[in-house]
Amino acid sequence: PQAGSEAPNLRTRAELRDGRWVLNGAKQFVSNGRRAGLAIVFAVTDATLGKKGISAFLVPTNTPGFRIDRSEHKMGIRASDTCAITLDDCSIPAANLLGERGKGLSIALSNLEGGRIGIAAQAVGIARAAFEAALLYSRERVQFDKPIGEHQSIANLLADMHTQINAARLLTLHAARLRSAGQPCLSEASQAKLFASEMAERVCSKALQIHGGYGYLEDFPVQRYYRDARITQIYEGASEIQRLLIARELKHYAL
């Protein structure tokens, strides 16, 4: 659980005993842990090799020793359960090693680009839902004898929201097209996730503001969009990590 963004700092261990892998450790923030029938677990198989000593395993969740400790109570994305799990002498067949021994980190990193593009798309979707709710409300809510959307202050907010959503969408599509074509897109995926996730929080905040007091009520969906948007800056690599990756890739930027 302590590894966080420092992925190589895993504490879960896997030991080969009598032809079977035995896993011990704990994992935090496991998405859909209560619903999954199969978990991909990363564990240290050789502590002397650092990040080259991490391997990936396929672990059926009904395996003895695989225990779900609790479901977390989150401010957002409540449709997806998030769990903490413990592996206590969890024994699996040797064939459940995913890929090669010591290649676990490579397997994890190979999926990050797609994951980050997916989170960028999620952020765009949340922001668009918030924008459309605000746009509809601005047409229906009348103040000072006209819909609030006709007041310049609200119109300017809506214009900014619309522009930022489209910019994030194009960044996301660009990264997705590169990945679909099999081209490198580490920086592009990070740019899409960074911009889209921070954009989503801004847009959802403005959407809530446009709704006024009603936006703060659970009867209106914008409060949910606001809560759901925040996680996109955290999982699949926090915004701070994305900035580090983008800056690192600038070393190869051709002038």
Question: Residue ranges of each PLM-predicted region?
Answer:
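Compact, aliphatic and Gly/Pro-tolerant "microcore" segments centered on a short helix or tight beta-hairpin
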Residues: 1-32
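Short Gly/Pro-enriched turn/cap motifs at secondary-structure boundaries
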Residues: 1-5, 29-32, 46-48, 74-81
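Long, acidic (Asp/Glu-rich), low-complexity accessory segments flanking structured domains
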Residues: 89-107
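Conserved hydrophobic/aromatic beta-strand scaffold that supports enzyme active sites
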Residues: 11-13, 38-42, 56-58, 82-89
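Alpha-helical interface subdomain recognition
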Residues: 7-9, 16-21, 84-86, 103, ...
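Short, glycine-/Ser/Thr-/acidic-enriched flexible segments
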Residues: 28, 35-36, 46-48, 62-64, ...
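Flexible, small-/acidic-enriched active-site or ligand-binding loops
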Residues: 9, 62-93
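A short core secondary-structure module
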Residues: 20, 24-68
